[in-house]
């Protein structure tokens, strides 16, 4: 495609019942046949749930807390977004195929769309879930600056789409529940964004235990410092400022916007909150999953 701008702001395309970027849908066979390796670590989240944060933590762990090594490249190349394929711009599958093991692999796919090779290889997976209201707000601002998404419309219009699952990667509700159930069968560490905000050191220790890595206290403290929001926000290899403006326009909204829990209270009207909560209870009542909307 000659004009790179042709790839942006296009409508989503349905893949097995899930709306995805048109370019992922076009190249779906390439994603579906992705070959996982047994020592891959998969990072899975619904969008705007702390993906970049946990990715940076894992890269710091794999580099023994050496922040300079983690500045070797942008986070989206150190931890490739497996299914993201944009003609002439990026191809997550190809990037990963060219990487040496052990690889850190990022995905936003719901559990039913994950390439089967991850299950066959019994890969370790880390899932991070964040409360729905904060995700909806963050996703709205992300749509404004990340041009692979369709135009979000007004906040009210976007919230309706979010509740209906008519956003990229489908319904938040099914996504978090699907991965929650799957953890009973496979090696999945299920973390909560709110716990990571409240006690990041404790959550990093959980990750280390899951990965069977024993590292000294001073290295853990380094990881804690270099993965903090303020340090990452100022770090060009973590904050996506190296991405071209046509793809992500940070003058519209920064990629790392606030990084807090409870910001939804600044966005939702009382009527929106009541409608959202009523709908939420119906969709989540049969699940054992419990979220905190603030800390």
UniProtKB/Swiss-Prot annotation:
It comes from the Eukaryota. The active site is at 108 (proton acceptor). 3'-phosphoadenylyl sulfate binds at residues 48-53, 130, 138, 193, 227, 257-259. One of its GO terms (biological process) is lipid metabolic process. Coiled coil: none annotated. It holds the Pfam family Sulfotransfer_1. One of its GO terms (cellular component) is cytoplasm. GO terms for molecular function: aryl sulfotransferase activity. InterPro entries: P-loop_NTPase (IPR027417), Sulfotransferase_dom (IPR000863). SUPFAM superfamilies: P-loop containing nucleoside triphosphate hydrolases. It is found in: Cytoplasm. It is an enzyme of class 2 (transferase). Substrate binds at residues 81, 106-108, 142. Sulfotransferase with broad substrate specificity that utilizes 3'-phospho-5'-adenylyl sulfate (PAPS) as sulfonate donor to catalyze the sulfate conjugation of catecholamines, such as dopamine, prostaglandins, leukotriene E4, drugs and xenobiotic compounds. Has sulfotransferase activity towards p-nitrophenol, 2-naphthylamine and minoxidil (in vitro). Sulfonation increases the water solubility of most compounds, and therefore their renal excretion, but it can also result in bioactivation to form active metabolites. This is Sulfotransferase 1 family member D1. The gene is Sult1d1.
């Amino acid at each position: 495609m000659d004009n790179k701008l042709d790839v942006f702001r296009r409508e989503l395309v349905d893949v097995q019942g899930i709306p995805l970027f048109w370019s992922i849908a076009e190249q779906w066979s390439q994603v579906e046949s992705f070959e996982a390796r047994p020592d891959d670590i998969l990072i899975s989240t619904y969008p705007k749930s702390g993906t970049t944060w946990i990715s940076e933590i894992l890269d710091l762990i794999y580099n023994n807390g050496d922040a300079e090594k983690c500045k070797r490249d942008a986070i989206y190349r150190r931890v490739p977004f497996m299914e993201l394929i944009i003609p002439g711009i990026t191809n997550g599958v190809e990037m990963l195929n060219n990487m040496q093991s052990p690889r850190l692999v990022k995905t936003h796919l719901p559990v039913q769309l994950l390439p089967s090779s991850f299950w066959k290889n019994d890969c370790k997976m880390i899932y991070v879930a964040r409360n729905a209201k904060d995700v909806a707000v963050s996703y709205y601002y992300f749509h404004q600056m990340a041009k692979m998404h369709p135009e979000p419309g007004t906040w009210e219009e976007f919230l309706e789409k979010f509740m209906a699952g008519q956003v990229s990667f489908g319904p938040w509700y099914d996504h978090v529940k699907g991965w929650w159930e799957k953890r009973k069968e496979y090696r999945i560490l299920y973390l909560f964004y709110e716990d990571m905000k409240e006690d990041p050191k404790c959550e990093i220790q959980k990750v280390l235990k899951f990965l069977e890595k024993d590292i000294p206290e001073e290295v853990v403290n380094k990881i804690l410092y270099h993965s903090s929001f303020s340090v990452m926000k100022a770090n060009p290899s973590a904050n996506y400022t190296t991405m071209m403006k046509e793809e992500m326009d940070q003058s519209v909204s920064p990629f790392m916007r606030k990084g807090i829990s409870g910001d939804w209270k600044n966005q939702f009207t009382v009527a929106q909150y009541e409608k959202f909560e009523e709908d939420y209870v119906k969709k989540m009542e049969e699940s054992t999953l419990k979220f905190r909307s603030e800390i």
